[in-house]
């Protein structure tokens, strides 16, 4: 059986239901130098963080009765920043924005670990959103899911016809609660993939932190 796979390192993907990887060059001109230069000096004991968690797909829609109706990254930023500032939050925590096929997963079953979802625009538009948050004094934290991934045929599962990213023993490699596959942390290549991915979002997208999801399934085998 021939499977069509996406590039695990792709920076952009076609909008669902299409699944092709798209080449992208990073040429964004960041304007958050002041924020980036000052964030390391922040003392959380004197100025605590107040974090607003948000799911971009459902926080606000152009048509509230159409679940396939989305604002762009920039349109979301224009609406979300004033609200966050008015409510007194210092940071937003974005539920997973890495490309994912199934809306019902809320992004927690991703296939494109190096790409912001194309539901709301392209990588440069996502950069512009983060840049705008920073210029307005708001930090950005990403939910990050290094624990499991879905079985979609274009994704990581059985990537080269073998158990490349997941455990071969399905007692360890399959999570019955989520109907998804567990990363094989025993493989150096898999650890490198995940660590590189975390660094990628900090270096290329200027994020301020990550919240690691489902750590219990990474540490324990009683799933």
Q: What do these predicted ranges mean?
A:
Residues 1-51, 61-64:
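The feature marks proteins involved in alpha-glucan
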Residues 40-46, 55-223:
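Substrate-binding/active-site clefts of carbohydrate-active enzymes
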